[in-house]
Amino acid sequence: MNLTLKIWRQANADATGSIETYPIENVSPDMSFLEMMDVLNEQLIGQGIDPVAFDHDCREGICGMCSMYINGEAHGPDRLVTTCQLHMRKFKDGDTITIEPFRANAFPVVKDLAVDRSAFDRIQHAGGFVSVNTSGNTQDANAIPIDKHDADKAFDAATCIGCGACVATCKNASAMLFVSAKVSQYALLPQGQVEATDRVLNMVKQMDEEGFGNCTNTGACEVECPKGISLENIARMNREYLSANVKG
């Protein structure tokens, strides 16, 4: 396939960015989107042009690094996949593809398509864990009965990879789906009950301090989430937050 790529280029967070156009030829439909970007960068280097900076790591849909806004959709036109799992067979010969970074005030551009998502790390650090010494002195997890429905819901929430697609696709740049997934995965399990009150209060507080917008229930985040995280988690977090405020 021969394609035209319109790519956001920006030297750093303080620089003025712009869309640059690059033609690319002989793209195999079997390539992943990132492999196509690798080929483009080889082409640019050969022409003496600075290669396009973009995040990537596992290339298996696990790490959440490969976040790109492709033709107006987080991770591109496919559903329940990350950018690295998107294949070029989803596009046609002669297509023009516009590629931008995930845009949000809380995700400043580092360079080109790479953004700083450390805001998610700080939210996670505020309470997205169970702070218990588990160095060999805890009872076997199988000794604590957990309803399968709750276990499945907790597992579904825990599949969140923190890619930021929910923020990028939300008109308010809300991080509610991400935070609610991290709250829910512990709210549904007995191990998470001890710190439940502090967890939800601290994580929501940190989310607000990072500058994310609020949720207005458009549902766009669930649609474009590569792991299909449900809006049910936002409702659960709201209940946890209300309960924590009443207790506090």
Task: Please state what every model-predicted region is.
Residues 31-50, 97-248:
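Ferredoxin-type iron-sulfur electron-transfer modules in oxidoreductases and energy-metabolism complexes
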Residues 20-32:
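Short, contiguous acidic and Ser/Thr-rich linear segments
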